């Protein structure tokens, strides 16, 4: 399958955040998946998939997400899977524990916790600017993602926490 994706780093946005959005898009790819599209509420997801009624069924937030925001998301969109993506497994585990302590584990049953390998994020940050050709392989049940960027190969770990 071939698809074109256009990403632009916004003022004040880190390149790491842009790369994490790209990796999240690649990990969760499905038809209709979109990056930075509003869904009509106060918050805007980094990556989202909608159902036929225009409601989020997949909401991905990368980087910093307040625990209060997470609570509002799972309450407002109970049918959606909410994916929290961070660069470091340790940071993800601490955030998850904070969310459980604040919101309760039962409120977070629709949340998936993912850490993408920092090495892959750094590798992409050093190489991405302008247009590129990117080939991606994400095996089912991925614990890694394999990339070829303009002919150069890269690989990164994917860790899912608390499943």
Residue ranges and their predicted role:
Residues 69-76, 95-98:
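A short acidic, amphipathic alpha-helical/loop segment
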Residues 89-95:
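Short, charged/polar "capping" segments at the starts of alpha-helices
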Residues 26-27, 87, 114:
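Cysteine-centric segments in proteins
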Residues 78-85, 108-112:
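Hydrophobic beta-strand segments of well-ordered beta-sheets in folded domains
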Residues 41-43, 50:
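Terminal alpha-helical anchor/extension segments at protein ends
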Residues 47-49, 56-69, 73, 82:
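Conserved catalytic cores of phosphodiester-cleaving nucleases, focusing on short active-site segments
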Residues 1-39:
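Acidic-basic catalytic patches of nuclease active cores, encompassing PD-(D/E)XK
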Residues 108-163:
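Non-catalytic C-terminal interaction segments of nucleic acid-processing enzymes
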